[in-house]
């Protein structure tokens, strides 16, 4: 088996975590991730401006109709989970979904080079971590606004066990809160990072296996790569949906009365 794989190992040159880097204020910056994130943000903003210019109270166009369906789906999820108090969560969850999905689409671009010019920003742990921390901060802000400062702290010491076991309650609830940003980050980062590796490995495998078949080999290589990219794009959409859904559920926990948990 090792001898069979030796030719493939010789042509594969995948370097996970390699980026176009530079220094800024003494900090190491992954510039490819920075500009990919900026481009994704510009795409989302541009889509919003286009939608705003084409919005009408009459018969909606296809673009506006798709947007209204997306908003309606998120609104229903928020209403079912949080109720009317969660109206402000709708734009946050929808924006996160669209932005993450746009970032994830970049993973299907530029496969085959040592350093992709436009990598998926979500395949670098810094962006998922930043978004996860932002979500958690906003969730705690909503909890304080909903329960008040006293109720916010009481929530962590008064349940799930009686108040006399407050230290145990604080420990368990503290662990739960620490785990939330970790799971949000690693779920998104891990899937996109692994997906990028699989795309690179598949491209190398197909090139090695069918590289000597001329035009037929080129066609087969393209077909395999396109099919896997479509599959990976579907995974990217699912991960964006999960991130947005968990955001809604975290707000639900923060904004619900204590007796509901």
Predicted regions located by residue number:
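Selective transmembrane helix interface/packing segments
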Residues: 1-261
